[in-house]
From Swiss-Prot:
Belongs to the RuBisCO large chain family. Type IV subfamily. This is 2,3-diketo-5-methylthiopentyl-1-phosphate enolase. It catalyses: 5-methylsulfanyl-2,3-dioxopentyl phosphate = 2-hydroxy-5-methylsulfanyl-3-oxopent-1-enyl phosphate. GO terms for biological process: carbon fixation; L-methionine salvage from methylthioadenosine. The lineage of its organism: Bacteria, Bacillati, Bacillota, Bacilli, Bacillales. It comes from Geobacillus kaustophilus (strain HTA426). Keywords: Amino-acid biosynthesis, Isomerase, Magnesium, Metal-binding, Methionine biosynthesis. Mg(2+) binds at K173, D175, E176. Its cofactor is Mg(2+).
Length: 413
């Protein structure tokens, strides 16, 4: 039987197995024991099956949170793929639709038959394709977040874009809250932004890509994205969870929108933060976004004010880069709270195939965005050379100023 395997964390006051069996039946054929033998035989291939139950010890922390004593278990349930079409809405409604309303169930993972998941696109470009576009293959990429643009005009945008590029960043992304407006129209951001970055390229020989925020009403997005591709957009930033995973997939699969897509995690916090219910970050921000076609995925770093736990962040990165999957690897982009002094930690945790993404850590540098970018580049070079940041800072004024402002986290070899 071809089946999607769902792994859950279940809580129940009395009988975990009974609850698990109820889920398996309730999300497939509805009932079993009351059916005549002939109907059972006809429906057997559609029946969900509890495959494994691993009981966990009782947790006082869990009991205190829910205000009652609960049993806990990791449960695996197989859902026959014959029951649903190969699309993400059908998958999500089957495995966690009404179940998400339970409040005491957490969806930890989904495992797919190979022939089923091959019906999904995965990233069009992925890590290798993005590296080819930037021309950088031997280090983490550096990205700057375009902050403070609301209420500004195109002249300000192009000026600030040049500064960030002159600092040596590989990519600049719009802020996710920058929408189409009279002051900063979408198409003009693309054309004026490209012209500004071309000037910097001619001056320095360094290529910088600009991720423009694709926004608007859902049914207008495809035409807008096609126009962006026609205008030569480098990358499309997309607030995927405001629209839906299926919309991301539709953008990825359209051959007239052959532009890398950067998935932003805005609104994912409504689904992932609790350890007791909702959806695990490695699935929601990792496996499913890669399946749907994101080339880059932003997610909270373990270091900032909106931090994920380190193992959760690493789990997202593993899901995005797992070589066993039949898709291109997607770029992990740990974000929030990043400054040059954290670069040793970022590279230790996420390796070279990651993107160092900073907003305030670049724009808040004493020498502005140019100094901020140079400080990050110096920090990356130092780590790759095996040098402590403080030693490298003695020879690099921009890095020294960054360390003076934000400090440094050295990592032992």
């Amino acid at each position: 039987m071809s089946a999607v395997m769902a792994t859950y964390l279940l809580h129940d006051e009395t009988d975990i197995r009974k609850k698990a069996e109820g889920i398996a039946l309730g999300l497939t054929i509805g009932t079993w024991t009351d059916l005549p033998a002939l109907e059972q035989e006809q429906l057997r291939k559609h029946k969900g099956e509890v495959v494994a139950i691993e009981e966990l010890g009782e947790s006082e922390r869990v009991n205190a949170y829910f205000g009652k004593r609960l049993k806990r278990a990791i449960v695996k349930i197989a859902y026959p793929t014959v029951n649903f079409s190969a699309d993400l809405p059908a998958l999500l409604v089957t495995t966690f639709g009404k179940l998400s309303l339970d409040g005491e169930v957490r969806l930890l993972d989904l495992e797919f038959p190979d022939e089923w998941k091959r019906q999904f696109p995965g990233p069009r470009f992925g890590i290798d394709g993005i590296r080819d576009r930037v021309g950088v293959h031997n280090r983490p990429l550096l990205m700057s977040i375009f902050k403070g643009m609301i209420g500004r005009d195109l002249a300000y945008l192009t000026s600030e874009l040049k500064k960030q590029a002159l600092g040596g960043v590989d990519l600049v992304k719009d802020d996710e809250i920058l929408f189409d407006s009279e002051l900063l129209p979408f198409e003009k951001r693309i054309t004026e932004g490209k012209a500004a970055l071309q000037e910097v390229y001619e001056q320095t020989g360094k290529r910088t890509l600009y991720a423009v925020n694709l926004t608007g009403k859902t049914f207008a997005l495809k035409d807008k994205a096609k126009r962006a591709a026609e205008l030569g957009a480098d990358v499309l930033l997309f607030n995927v969870f405001a629209y839906g995973l299926d919309v991301l997939q539709a953008l990825r699969e359209d051959e007239e929108i052959a532009v890398p897509i950067m998935a932003h995690p805005a609104f994912s916090g409504a689904v992932t933060p609790s350890e007791f219910y909702g959806v695990a970050p490695s699935l929601w921000l990792g496996k499913l976004l890669r399946l749907a076609g994101a080339d880059f995925v932003l997610f909270p770093s373990p270091y900032g004010s909106v931090a994920l736990e380190r193992e959760q962040a690493l789990g997202i990165a593993r899901a995005l880069t797992d070589d066993q999957e039949p898709f291109a690897r997607a770029f992990p982009v740990p974000s929030a709270g990043i400054h040059p002094g954290l670069v040793p930690l970022i590279i230790r945790d996420f390796g070279l195939d990651t993107i160092v993404n900073a907003g305030g850590g670049i724009h808040g540098h004493p020498d502005g965005a140019i100094g901020g970018g140079r400080a990050f580049r110096a920090a990356i070079d130092a780590v790759l050379a095996g040098r402590p940041l403080r030693a490298a800072a003695a020879e690099n004024e921009a890095l020294q100023k960054a360390i003076d402002r934000w400090g440094v986290v050295e990592v032992e070899a």
